[in-house]
Amino acid sequence: MAKHSHDHTHDHHDRPRRVRKPGEPLRIGVGGPVGSGKTALVAAICRQLRDELSLAVLTNDIYTTEDADFLRKHAVLPDSRIIAVQTGGCPHTAIRDDITANLDAIDDLIAAHDALDLILVESGGDNLTATFSSGLVDVQIFVIDVAGGDKVPRKGGPGVTFSDLLVVNKTDLAPLVGADLKVMARDAEAVRDGRPTVLQSLTEDPAATKVLDWVRSQLAAAG
């Protein structure tokens, strides 16, 4: 494996913050609890962008390659553009505390595919505390779903509060679980200090239109 670059500054937590150089792919992290719909969202983004951009996906699982296998099975990208990292422990460690394996995998993707525009980095399923290191991704999406009830945004947590985009997924299930989407939207707005929130159902909108619009805006801003 290629060794990652150590070009970075430091944020206020003294964690390495990557400095994205011109021509480097934008890295977007996709995190959230188990079963919230992270992999399905990654698949939707890939299907919509694969004909206009050069992109790749890096998944994280504890002991398996299940998420990467799902993406390959559904042919959202050529197999060589999907890499799995087996974290072998707490999934948030590999995306926040010791990101070496992820950085090396990203280097491998960049070496194998010229002029990548976007790399999606999917975390292993974890609770509401998991966030990405600023040395690993440029921006991050945090995915929750309505199955946990409308109290989830109110509970907060770093992912809900500080992610660049919060996605409340599976809104079509709200009537079945008694979740009030207006309450979820209101509570998310209250804790997110102006950061955007999207409520969506991939069943009703397989293209993930609002999330895709946000991804496009990040790509445009990144130049």
UniProtKB/Swiss-Prot annotation:
GO terms for cellular component: cytoplasm. It comes from the Bacteria. Its main location: cytoplasm. InterPro entries: CobW/HypB/UreG_nucleotide-bd, P-loop_NTPase, UreG. GO terms for molecular function: GTP binding; GTPase activity; nickel cation binding. GTP binds at G32, P33, V34, G35, S36, G37, K38, T39. Residues 1-30 are annotated as: Disordered. GO terms for biological process: urea catabolic process. Keywords: Chaperone, Cytoplasm, GTP-binding, Nickel insertion, Nucleotide-binding. It is found in: Cytoplasm. Homodimer. UreD, UreF and UreG form a complex that acts as a GTP-hydrolysis-dependent molecular chaperone, activating the urease apoprotein by helping to assemble the nickel containing metallocenter of UreC. The UreE protein probably delivers the nickel. Facilitates the functional incorporation of the urease nickel metallocenter. This process requires GTP hydrolysis, probably effectuated by UreG. Belongs to the SIMIBI class G3E GTPase family. UreG subfamily. This is Urease accessory protein UreG. It comes from Mycobacterium ulcerans (strain Agy99). The gene is ureG.
